[in-house]
Amino acid sequence: MKKLLISAVSALVLGSGAAFANSNVPDHAFSFEGIFGKYDQAQLRRGFQVYNEVCSACHGMKFVPIRTLADDGGPQLDPTFVREYAAGLDTIIDKDSGEERDRKETDMFPTRVGDGMGPDLSVMAKARAGFSGPAGSGMNQLFKGMGGPEYIYNYVIGFEENPECAPEGIDGYYYNKTFQIGGVPDTCKDAAGVKITHGSWARMPPPLVDDQVTYEDGTPATVDQMAQDVSAFLMWAAEPKLVARKQMGLVAMVMLGLLSVMLYLTNKRLWAPYKGHKA
């Protein structure tokens, strides 16, 4: 029983954190971390606004149902707004009729494919080693040290000017101190061919600038704030039931604890008269 209780506690604590094991990514405190952590509804709404107005141009979320925007524990947007929002997205081919129709709230978010489009963000925030995601999601990024809300946040704010070792004329590539698997020019490598820069170059340009969106709640739209908000939103998109699972884990811990106490007291009452007496 003690081992079972310890296992339950360990599973809850390990499952509640969202940090992926990557020493190159500084930790960032999110409201949903920890045993008692939960999503900040206002932050999820701001994050959805950033995704919708900025990120969705190049990144899809094809595994996320649009209707979940109205669910409890998430952005909890008005169902009427969600229906209208879905109808304004890219049209979809109906599976039954084969004809083009407006997207419904029961459909998934659109996907983005083609030259210049980025990876799907449906489960990018799942920070689990060995998690490869649904088929076709391109989640091999996780095996390369990418993924998790901390990574997304640090990546978005990680764009910097080219280091001094970079040659002139690196057009179409952008240096990011968090991005570890991109290209590195020979001038930024040592004699052994090992890069001397902390980060590398990505094809994706810096996605955010200050005041790029206007938050409805009046929150200043700094790059740092928008990066935090969209990272939290993508975590919710990947783990919409995270808080519910934590609550179930807490209930299980309490019940296991009570059961352990009851078993101890029962054992003591039944066997105490016989213990210590020699035959």
UniProtKB/Swiss-Prot annotation:
Membrane topology (UniProt): Single-pass membrane protein
Keyword Cell membrane: yes
Subcellular localization, as worded in the UniProt entry: Cell membrane
Signal peptide (UniProt feature, chain positions): 1-21
SUPFAM superfamilies: Cytochrome c
GO CC, any one term: plasma membrane
Post-translational modification note: Binds 1 heme c group covalently per subunit.
Its job: Component of the ubiquinol-cytochrome c reductase complex (complex III or cytochrome b-c1 complex), which is a respiratory chain that generates an electrochemical potential coupled to ATP synthesis. c1 functions as an electron donor to cytochrome c.
Subunit structure: The main subunits of complex b-c1 are: cytochrome b, cytochrome c1 and the Rieske protein.
Name of this protein: Cytochrome c1
The species this protein was found in: Rhodobacter capsulatus (strain ATCC BAA-309 / NBRC 16581 / SB1003)
Lineage: Bacteria, Pseudomonadati, Pseudomonadota, Alphaproteobacteria, Rhodobacterales
Record gene name: petC
